[in-house]
Amino acid sequence: MAQQAADKYLYVDKNFINNPLAQADWAAKKLVWVPSSKNGFEPASLKEEVGEEAIVELVENGKKVKVNKDDIQKMNPPKFSKVEDMAELTCLNEASVLHNLKERYYSGLIYTYSGLFCVVINPYKNLPIYSEEIVEMYKGKKRHEMPPHIYAITDTAYRSMMQDREDQSILCTGESGAGKTENTKKVIQYLAHVASSHKSKKDQGELERQLLQANPILEAFGNAKTVKNDNSSRFGKFIRINFDVNGYIVGANIETYLLEKSRAIRQAKEERTFHIFYYLLSGAGEHLKTDLLLEPYNKYRFLSNGHVTIPGQQDKDMFQETMEAMRIMGIPEDEQMGLLRVISGVLQLGNIAFKKERNTDQASMPDNTAAQKVSHLLGINVTDFTRGILTPRIKVGRDYVQKAQTKEQADFAIEALAKATYERMFRWLVLRINKALDKTKRQGASFIGILDIAGFEIFDLNSFEQLCINYTNEKLQQLFNHTMFILEQEEYQREGIEWNFIDFGLDLQPCIDLIEKPAGPPGILALLDEECWFPKATDKSFVEKVVQEQGTHPKFQKPKQLKDKADFCIIHYAGKVDYKADEWLMKNMDPLNDNIATLLHQSSDKFVSELWKDVDRIIGLDQVAGMSETALPGAFKTRKGMFRTVGQLYKEQLAKLMATLRNTNPNFVRCIIPNHEKKAGKLDPHLVLDQLRCNGVLEGIRICRQGFPNRVVFQEFRQRYEILTPNSIPKGFMDGKQACVLMIKALELDSNLYRIGQSKVFFRAGVLAHLEEERDLKITDVIIGFQACCRGYLARKAFAKRQQQLTAMKVLQRNCAAYLRLRNWQWWRLFTKVKPLLNSIRHEDELLAKEAELTKVREKHLAAENRLTEMETMQSQLMAEKLQLQEQLQAETELCAEAEELRARLTAKKQELEEICHDLEARVEEEEERCQYLQAEKKKMQQNIQELEEQLEEEESARQKLQLEKVTTEAKLKKLEEDQIIMEDQNCKLAKEKKLLEDRVAEFTTNLMEEEEKSKSLAKLKNKHEAMITDLEERLRREEKQRQELEKTRRKLEGDSTDLSDQIAELQAQIAELKMQLAKKEEELQAALARVEEEAAQKNMALKKIRELETQISELQEDLESERASRNKAEKQKRDLGEELEALKTELEDTLDSTAAQQELRSKREQEVSILKKTLEDEAKTHEAQIQEMRQKHSQAVEELADQLEQTKRVKATLEKAKQTLENERGELANEVKALLQGKGDSEHKRKKVEAQLQELQVKFSEGERVRTELADKVTKLQVELDSVTGLLSQSDSKSSKLTKDFSALESQLQDTQELLQEENRQKLSLSTKLKQMEDEKNSFREQLEEEEEAKRNLEKQIATLHAQVTDMKKKMEDGVGCLETAEEAKRRLQKDLEGLSQRLEEKVAAYDKLEKTKTRLQQELDDLLVDLDHQRQSVSNLEKKQKKFDQLLAEEKTISAKYAEERDRAEAEAREKETKALSLARALEEAMEQKAELERLNKQFRTEMEDLMSSKDDVGKSVHELEKSKRALEQQVEEMKTQLEELEDELQATEDAKLRLEVNLQAMKAQFERDLQGRDEQSEEKKKQLVRQVREMEAELEDERKQRSMAMAARKKLEMDLKDLEAHIDTANKNREEAIKQLRKLQAQMKDCMRELDDTRASREEILAQAKENEKKLKSMEAEMIQLQEELAAAERAKRQAQQERDELADEIANSSGKGALALEEKRRLEARIAQLEEELEEEQGNTELINDRLKKANLQIDQINTDLNLERSHAQKNENARQQLERQNKELKAKLQEMESAVKSKYKASIAALEAKIAQLEEQLDNETKERQAASKQVRRTEKKLKDVLLQVEDERRNAEQFKDQADKASTRLKQLKRQLEEAEEEAQRANASRRKLQRELEDATETADAMNREVSSLKNKLRRGDLPFVVTRRIVRKGTGDCSDEEVDGKADGADAKAAE
């Protein structure tokens, strides 16, 4: 029953498919698909076709509807209903795909193949298709053998991994709620079952169980209920399952992406937070609730919606399942309780309430009950916790202060803490699961990755999390498109097969670039990261920057809703998504309270402190948090000190994921959501259609059908399928390609089914599966034959064995019979009794000999035992010696291995250093290029400053002229004031109407600009259709003219001749009617002509209309153009009327020649025509006179505007001179700035390079010293202990000498780099002082320049406004009332034109869409027909093959019948022979009977002589018996022969009947086949002809489109060139000035940042160098202690004191040189106290060493007590070795700390202080380790008591080494002195730089005074201007208001725009 239920949801009902009624109905009704608003598409019957439309009858209700042909889609035959692979559909279109999916979904079949991938629709219910039996059904099966299922996809990936040894990935994609997570679980379930190393089904391995239980844990902690999905994954995961070579699972790893941690604190309506919160509150027992302080749901603020339940799920049961899963995963109970405590603590954090105090904004906590619960659960102090929230300690300067928080800040801190705590717990859980899943020791050979990431989300308002999720889905969809469409076709082209590249238009790269592009222009994430750098940045500024940078992007839109709605929109592949950028900056930076984080790090709860162990790396500064590095192996390792945001980390993780997926073979599963109501059995067609379009399902099927999805390498194809063509390939060598060609010929494959490339054979879909089936059949036949041979061989072998047994039995029988005859013979009895007696005597002799031999053997045995005991003793001794030698040899090999490892490390470090050197060289080259670029910029700035100075001079002269002109203009203004008051009302009306017109025109022009691109693409089609339309219109006009002329004549004849007959009256009536129609047609004709002309000139006139509306000149030009157009229309009308009159004449002559009345009417008509001609000529003359008047007016206006233009040019020249003077000054400043930048860049580059080299070489030096000392010790040990193993000793000596050479080389390199470092430090200090001076000068000059630029801009604005007002007043006075009338006429005309244009544009757009639809429909039909043609060809080839096979079978039947006839003849002959034999045998039998009677008589006669004749009697009896037997056998043979003869006769008759039937059937089949073949040939020929016609038509259309496109492109390029030339003159000056200002500001900001960084890094570097030198002194002193005890201790104390003095001196110098270094003074003092404490402990240890030295001296004096002396020496040596190693580790750690402190200066020493504290803890641990190692050393010394002499030799060697170390210490002290001298020189240079800076400051003050004077003059001018008239004041205020809201660059642009307008 269970299997039948599962089959219902897997297999299709064949009866439904093979229904003949449905087939007949489909063929009879001509069923098609038509669009439906309700069902997407619905079936209809095609009734009639009328032009472009068709009449269809809907199947559902029988209603007849008119539908456009382009909207109709073909329907597949019923046999394709519910097809499993949609690539098999004959008609591939959206309707067929949707119908197939819908039918399968309603039948419970949720899985459907779509070409190469699988489509699954969420059923919203449980289906019985995931059991163990179903898994077994799909195990090892091919894809076409089983129905579609997720198991089939998984099995295909698994088999491909095993067969091709290629990593696989299964990508489950789709929207949220489509079923991705459930399908991911089914994939893991199948792999755990199939690839388990445990064969039994019941006994499942621990690893497989843990793998299956990982998902429930992650779902509990990372999934939640949303509006669309009850179990929505709120994080992404990539599950990597590793397999060994045999295909067994050896481990797994889970990578997670972007947990939506904000859900832990708030949820949307009807949504839940993460499941684990509800599981815990519902499933915890009373004891657990009291321990975790749990409360009801409504008591928690973070549970926004209270207790929201999920239908069909019990939270209590799920809690038990989750705890059981954690137990299976191996998570101990204490860690489980830690997780639950953290969950309860997160809930309690939401209950902490804050209150605002009355008089201040400070927050307070009136009730700390929740805080006490949180502190109890998390193991922290409640007072410290509340203090850290309400009054956290922050660092201000060098001190720490407590800052009071507001209520909002406290709430934000609590929420941030809750989110961070939950996120860290989730990361820890993932790390713990990975640790459990990756504990096996087996090596993984390949892997299968399963991707389950959050689906595409479109809410009403979407936030930062949705952007990241949708960005991920965009990348995955792009991967799908690239894999399915681009890479597939590129491989076709790469392999050189015939293929036309198809562009499916599914490139998502623009949208991805909009989000992730780093620069040019930067994407949204880059802009977000950039805004995070600025302290005053807000979400609003971020949105403004996004709109500014990406406002013109095609995938970016501004929202059209209210202000509180979305901030911007992005057009994703799944639709348009509105984003609200609230708190995006905070989410991207993810800040946290440092005080609380430190408190949690120090928690008494081990689990909580483990979660917060990386407290020093909480904020986005530094690299990723330490825990995230381990928990998220996908994180990229970046340089320390970089600002790491959430967006950057997620982008890097996603980049690594995409790289992993690209390196695998992807298998796509497209999950589709059927409805948003989560109802089972309901499918929303439009929703599914949108998902199918977005996912590229149709395109994937089409490329699968048209392309060659299966491909095999030549060698593999030959190896796999050569069994199908055994004799096709000749023996000997043959190229793989030639062999494949021969094999394909032998296989008789159709040429359309395959393509042969350069390295592979490509097959269409299904061909390879067919070959696999044939191969399986062939292998089956071969195996059956092989089995038959084996069985025959075994049967023959068994028969031979039975024959041997038979002969043996006969021998035994014969022997037994002989024995029975002999046993009673007396002589035999005597022989048996005597024979044993003969052997007894010989046996006694043998016993005596054996006894003698036994005695000898015993003696030998005793001797051998003695020798054996001796040998055993010797063996035991030798074994002991052997063990000793083996131990020695093992020790030697280990030493050699260590030496080899050291050598490998040194080589690796050498390579790293070389790589670093190459990187530094590359950086040097980059810096040189940057310097060159800066020099070029410097020259440009100098030129700009010179130009500005000249402009200032010109402006000064212009200002004086303006003062003179001001008096005259005031007088003019007074005169104009009266006129202005009169015209003001009219002007206001005109201005308002003009504004409205301009706004409408601007809107229409923007629309036209947007549609222009479409019109260009449409131009190709439009020109073609216009030509067709013009032809048709001309024909229509001719016919209409003819009809109109006839009707006119009739009407006129009616009016003129009332006395005519009735026929004439009817004609007159018709003429009257035709007159009316003629008037209408004339209007339509005029409109059509105007439309054609305006559309032809639309592209050329679109840009001109904006300028025409701006000024009255453009209005006059527009009037002129309209008059010309009307004149042309009138002329055309005149010509048309002339043509009509001529036509009327001819017709009248033809029709009315018979009557005289008709002649009179014709004469009257001619008179009327002459009158009409005269009126037309008069109208033309008046029209020309009007045009002449308008031309005169236009010329006068042009002359006046030219005069004004000359005046404005002169003013502009004066302003440009002043601008040049200012630009010259700015150029000088820019030169100085660039020089400073260049110096700074060089110094920074050199400093970083030398510091990196110094650090690397110091590490290398310390490693070399350690290696050298270790090798020296090991060499001495080897010399003493392994005298016999001389070969190994020589090898170790050679290695040690090689390492010493390397060490000496490294020492020389270190000295060189140190000298370079000294020089670089000197240069850096000098440059830094100069840089400070120049920066001060730059700032002063920059301020001066900004003030002067502001003054210049104000003057330019005033001048522009004055000129604009003057020109406006002049125009108003001149134009007057005429302007109003012309404006109104122009307004009406423009409105008409715009309405006509918009209507025509809509018509063209609709026509274009219609043509596009027809094109796509025809293309799809063509593709379907091509596919159908391929299928027909394939079927024809299959039929031909079947015909050949049938002929072969017929020939075989004929041969078989001939064989049967021969066998029949042969059997008859044999029967006749056997009859004769039977007769002869019968005669022989009669004779034998007679002989028997005679023998019986003789028997009676001679019975008395029985004994004598016994033998003869027996012989005769035997012969009789044998004769009887032979008789019976012959009779039996005769009977058998008769039966065989009868059977043969029957068979012969049957074969003859069968032969007749076969011949009849053969004739019938041949006739039928010929008819079918002929019909199909005819059909194929017809289809071929149709296709050829369609292809020719398409080619012709394509050629026309190409020509039109080339013409349009040429016109477009010409227009663009003209536009660029016009815009270039306007924009060059503005762009240069704006770019210079922007570059100057950027350089200033960079200069400030660099100076701050330089000061901070210099202070930190000097402090760290002092500490490094101190530690280096300690290291060298401790190394000296190891070799010479007393001298080392004294040297160490001196070095320590000296280092402390130097440290104090350097600390004082740092405090004096940099003010910012005092920020960390308090922390430094605390750390120094800690260091002093450690130094005291070190002195205690040194005191211990002094005691050991005393013992050593006593041992030297008392040489007799050599053993104790040896103990002391060895303990001392081992202690020094440990101390040296410890100091080396300290040195390495301090150097690492140096790098970390340099990188962490920006975060105010927080990270460095934490690192130092961690370092102190490590030093304490090292002290403990030292004591343990000392004890181990004492144990080791006891073993080496016999080796005192060798130790003494080692002591002498160590003394020599100590002397060398002393020399090195002296060198280091000299280097320290040199560094001090460099520091003093740097301070002197700093003083000199300060002096020069003060000098520049004085010069700057002088410059500011001059600027103030100029400002005063400007202000005086402003006061004078304010005393002017009202209109001027109004306009000036408007300008100020506009500039106040804009940036500086926008102000400059507007000022320049005003200049341009004034110039016009």
UniProtKB/Swiss-Prot annotation:
One GO molecular-function entry: microfilament motor activity
Omega-N-methylarginine: modified positions: R1923
Binding-site residues for ATP, renumbered to this chain: G174, E175, S176, G177, A178, G179, K180, T181
Residues found modified as N-acetylalanine: A2
Region (Actin-binding): 654-676
Residues modified to N6-acetyllysine: 8, 102, 299, 435, 613, 860, 975, 1024, 1234, 1249, 1357, 1392, 1404, 1410, 1459, 1638, 1793, 1802, 1845
Record domain Myosin motor: where: 81-776
Name of the protein described by the UniProt record: Myosin-9
